C-alpha cells in the first residue's frame, strides 16, 4: 500500500466526495480499487480522472520538454504568493466496519475465484483497513494524523512479511511484480 501518505490522501478524497443521499460504499469502492489494482495513468487528464490530482489544484503540461520549466514557474508563483502548508484536517469521514465489510467481502470473493493470491488478499484488507479508518464500529470523523498513523502501521507490518520482500526484490531485479 502507499506508505507516504497516499492512502490517507485517498481516504480524504473519499470523505470529500461523500454526499447526502449517496451510497457511501460506492465512493469508497471506486477509490479503493484505484489503489488496490495499482492503476497507472498515461496522461495528466487520466491522472485527474483516477483521483491522483486534486480538483482545481493542478495544471497539465502537454509538452514533456516543458515539465521542469512549468514546475519551476509554478513553485516560484506559490512561493511569491506566500504559500504555506495547509493546516491538517480533523474532519475526515471514514466508514469504519460498514466499509470494511465491503472490502473484506470483495477480497474474499476475489481470492475464492482465484483472481488474487492470499498475500494480495492480505494487502487488500490492510489497504481497506486504513481507508475505512480502522476497526471503528460506525462511520466516524477522524484526523489526518490518525489516518497517517494507521497507514504507517499497515505499511510497516507488510514490510515485515517475507512475501512483500520477495515482491520488492522482484521489482528491483526483474522490473516485474511477483504474484506470490
Segments (PLM) and residue ranges:
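Glycine-rich phosphate/ribose-binding loops and adjacent secondary-structure elements
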Residues: 1-17
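Intrinsically disordered, low-complexity segments enriched in small/flexible residues
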Residues: 12-39, 43, 55-180
Amino acid at each position: 500500500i502507499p506508505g507516504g501518505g497516499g492512502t490517507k490522501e485517498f481516504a480524504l478524497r473519499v470523505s470529500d466526495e461523500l454526499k447526502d443521499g449517496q451510497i457511501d460504499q460506492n465512493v469508497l469502492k471506486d477509490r479503493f480499487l484505484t489503489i488496490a489494482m495499482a492503476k497507472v495513468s498515461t496522461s495528466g487528464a487520466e491522472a485527474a480522472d483516477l483521483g491522483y490530482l486534486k480538483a482545481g489544484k493542478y495544471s497539465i503540461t502537454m509538452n514533456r520538454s516543458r515539465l521542469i520549466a512549468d514546475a519551476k514557474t509554478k513553485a516560484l508563483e506559490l512561493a511569491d504568493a506566500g504559500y504555506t502548508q495547509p493546516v491538517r484536517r480533523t474532519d475526515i469521514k471514514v466508514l469504519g466496519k460498514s466499509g470494511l465489510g465491503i472490502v473484506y467481502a470483495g477480497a474474499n470473493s476475489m481470492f475464492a475465484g482465484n483472481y488474487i493470491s492470499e498475500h494480495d488478499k492480505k494487502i487488500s484488507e490492510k489497504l481497506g483497513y486504513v481507508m475505512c479508518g480502522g476497526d471503528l464500529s460506525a462511520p466516524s470523523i477522524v484526523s489526518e494524523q490518525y489516518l497517517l498513523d494507521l497507514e504507517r502501521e499497515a505499511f510497516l507490518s507488510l514490510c515485515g512479511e517475507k512475501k512483500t520482500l520477495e515482491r520488492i526484490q522482484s521489482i528491483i531485479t526483474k522490473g516485474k511484480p511477483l504474484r506470490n
